[in-house]
Amino acid sequence: MRVLDSHLHLWDPSVLDYPWLEGPLRARFAAEEIAGTIGEVGDERGFVFVQADCLEAQYLDEIDWVTSLAEQVGVRGIVAGARLDRGAATVRHLDAFAERPLVVGVRHLLQGEPVGFAATPAFRAGAAALAERGLTFDACVRGEGQLRDVIRLAAEMPELRIVLDHLGKPAVGTAATPSLPSAEWANALTALAAHSQVFCKLSGLPAEARGSWSAEQTEPFFDVALEAFGPERLMVGSDWPVSAVTASGWNSGADAALDAGAIGAWADAVASWAASRAVDVDAILWSNAERFYRLS
């Protein structure tokens, strides 16, 4: 089994500034730390790094730092941080990627913006500049209102390749008290998937469960995504280290409360589910991410 993890975070608070970090996540997660977690993950593996919300002024520094680790970690592509609503400054920022060949896409973290932000002229101008450069957009949203914003974005900008992070962050409950997919979320996912340039990451649900998750709990959500997108537009993502925080880590902030086997456990859960549905496991674990991000 080979695994191309489409959603990896790396950071070092001694190198860059991340105001949002707290609890067990306020630590270094870089080459040395991930080396101890991936020994059992696949016969062949690679990663797509996704920006980790450092300070905006450090976005290019983040790319350069991750690039310095790329060979050691196995990073094959970088989804860079960018504000798409800065007009000429956005264009200059995107043009700086030309000297940074690992950059394959951008994430402007929409979950921190108000509903409707993705329809503003300033954001749309930046999104158009992104599409013109052949770069992808990672849409990280929460709630049906923001999901509807991404549906509208996809409908009105078919030239922009979009991937939905973390299935849109649905409410999943916990392993002990699991939730079933809501009709609103399922309908929104189906509407989004109607646009063929949109893909979806099977990622992030352990964090939504606050570290208390089970493979069985995730399957109804995967099934909705499969029905909507088909097996050719789904990709696995570990969301490491955020989704590696254990329930005790979320509850107490304990410094050591991370699951060392989280990357492998998530890949195994996705692979087992895909096999049980008789769909192409390698597509979801590898080739779809490679195709979407156009990794060489």
Give names to the regions the model predicted:
Residues M1-R133, G145, L180, L192, ...:
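Mid-domain alpha/beta scaffold segments of enzyme catalytic cores
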Residues M1-S6, P19, A27-G46, V224, ...:
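Mid-to-C-terminal alpha-helical segments outside catalytic/metal-binding sites
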Residues L10-D12, C54, K169, A207, ...:
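Active-site micro-motifs of SAM-dependent methyltransferase domains
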Residues V66, V150-L153, V270:
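Hydrophobic packing residues within well-ordered alpha-helices of enzyme cores
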Residues V73-R76, V104, L160-R161, F199, ...:
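Secondary-structure boundary/capping positions in well-ordered alpha/beta enzyme cores
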Residues A119-M235, A244-N251:
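Catalytic pocket-lining loop regions of alpha/beta-barrel enzymes
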